[in-house]
């Protein structure tokens, strides 16, 4: 049955994506939902909850308010809390009940902004989309609102290597097991200055000066919207890629250099990948990688380039195809078409459980979150490498999430192949 999950889980929702993206920016984020509904985010979607303070709340929407379409209590509560806590900004994110109420989040944001005198965002999330759309829209709107105009920036420091921003970094894709630190180290160890990381581990001052970077590196699909916003604001070129394994790491760094030199966007994941000599029978296995598109494509490139795999397909259950086609392609066909071409060659965007089960019928090796083991064929053995994803199974397998940046990916993979 379409759009029904019997044995698989669902990905973190868009409202949690908004909260995750804005978590470290010093604002007050409100989930407009019934009391207690914030526990899903606090418990399963936010590993920083007990270690990094943030103002993330739930509005406590009541049944009567929902039936009557009453927004006055929300306005009063937000106004009172903001005056007491003095946040840098306010963001209100929707859930399924406000969607059915027809809540005007943009109108509420405009009204609160006039009353409070600070920036207020209204995100019409509804809990039916994944975190990818939530993170993408939150980071993009934050960049539009907060990044300083060109005349207030000092420009790059003129070093030998380009200065970069890392875009689309949240615990939902990178967890808190060392990947963010490793990602920064990959660039810094090669002489690249990391201006800001959107949005983990960078202070607000660094974020608002993102226009001083030479190149933006979108390390997840959720970072593409922000890359395009910064390109429109400053003319900064962007690179779409994730440094997984030595060969792809080198390719991503070369793409950064090329983008800085030419001013053109680079898509290292879309380039042809040469295999290696000395293939074995194991390299010919039909292999599937299931997960976030940029991460999965990066693993695919590494398997082909470093291990000689020649039958590697990607299954992306997130709405990346919709993001590419509807929200990013308009007027930008030349910039992003290579991504779509690569996606078509590499695999498929499949959101339904029955579609994923059908595609895996010929699988010989699957690399995915442990929950996907339930979708394997029942009539034969299939090799399965567990690769937990915070944005899918939450905290359940967090301790098993590896550091997959640079050469550390190879060490982890070779210990399990």
Feature roles, as predicted:
Residues 1-417:
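An N-terminal assembly and electron-transfer interface module characteristic of large anaerobic redox
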